[in-house]
Regions:
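Terminal and linker regions of secretory-pathway proteins
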Residues: 1-281
Length: 281
């Protein structure tokens, strides 16, 4: 609820140039967010550093007219049937995906069903695997675990003093502002939430890779019949980061739900920071 419904309308408004739903729908969904209490909730708990106190449960989405996420989700798919909630800037046709997920454009072969991959992973060879598989044996009574922000995560931060939460801004399943509110409701190492606001300017730097010049040359000179390029990733300022009391929070404009899939350079940089490679990302 917190990472979806309470923050979905501000996210939709932010991405109007990518998700241009009609004015009538936008006016209706904005008015409903206000009447259901989501707007005031969002404005209060995304701007208070330190937080004013324990953050209450968001307004109930089961109240009439307050299930905003599902209404927005359906409206987007009518407009763009190839919409990907894990990476909101995708359009038709479906992108080819060797993993078969999260796009619906799965390729002719499933990477996880390759026998050499299964052997390398010590997985049973010949089993029909696919990414993020569900099924009756996976949480048959739903996942009963306590939300991490209400239980184990503060303890993990205190025990390690080296915890990173990264959030792609192109994720339309979980929203960065929802995760930030969750952080603001956690107490760790003696204080609740971040005591100062995270950076509002890009400050997460990824070093440049020589392969970028090679790819730029191919593009600028329209060189034909070049082999596929796999060994590169974006560089420069790739997001924002903020650290307090052993917790680092990073927001990443070019990533969706899966950070290593969309911006692998940032993923490696975060791992380097995690293992002690410098005092900043």
């Amino acid at each position: 609820l917190l990472t979806e419904i309470a923050v979905v309308v501000p996210a939709l408004q932010y991405f109007r140039n990518v998700i241009p739903l009609n004015e009538t729908f936008m006016a209706d969904i904005t008015a409903r967010a206000q009447s259901c209490g989501y707007t005031d909730f969002f404005n209060k708990y995304t701007t208070s550093f330190p937080p004013p106190g324990p953050i209450p449960i968001p307004p109930d989405s089961l109240l009439p007219g307050c299930d905003l996420y599902d209404d927005i989700y359906n409206a987007i798919y009518y407009m763009n049937p190839c919409f990907n909630i894990y990476h909101l800037t995708e359009y038709c046709p479906y992108l080819y995906d060797e993993l078969g997920f999260p796009s619906l454009g799965g390729g002719p072969s499933n990477y996880f069903n390759r026998s050499d991959v299964q052997k390398a992973l010590h997985a049973p060879i010949g089993t029909d695997f696919y990414e993020c598989a569900g099924g009756p044996n996976l949480f048959p009574n739903t996942d009963q675990s306590i939300p991490s922000g209400l239980g184990p995560l503060p303890s993990v931060i205190e025990r390690t003093n080296n915890t990173i939460i990264g959030h792609g801004l192109l994720d339309f399943l979980l929203f960065a502002n929802g995760s930030l509110i969750t952080i603001q409701n956690m107490t760790w190492n003696g204080y609740q939430g971040f005591q100062s606001p995270p950076s509002s300017t890009m400050n997460l730097f990824v070093p440049y890779n020589p392969s970028l010049d090679y790819i730029l040359n191919i593009v600028n000179n329209a060189i034909p019949n070049t082999p596929p390029q796999h060994d590169t990733a974006g560089a420069g300022m790739q997001g924002t980061w903020h650290t307090e009391r052993g917790l680092t929070w990073a927001t990443l404009p070019l990533a969706g739900h899966e950070i290593p899939q969309y911006i692998p350079g940032v993923a490696y940089r975060m791992m380097e920071f995690f293992f002690g490679g410098g005092s900043r990302i």
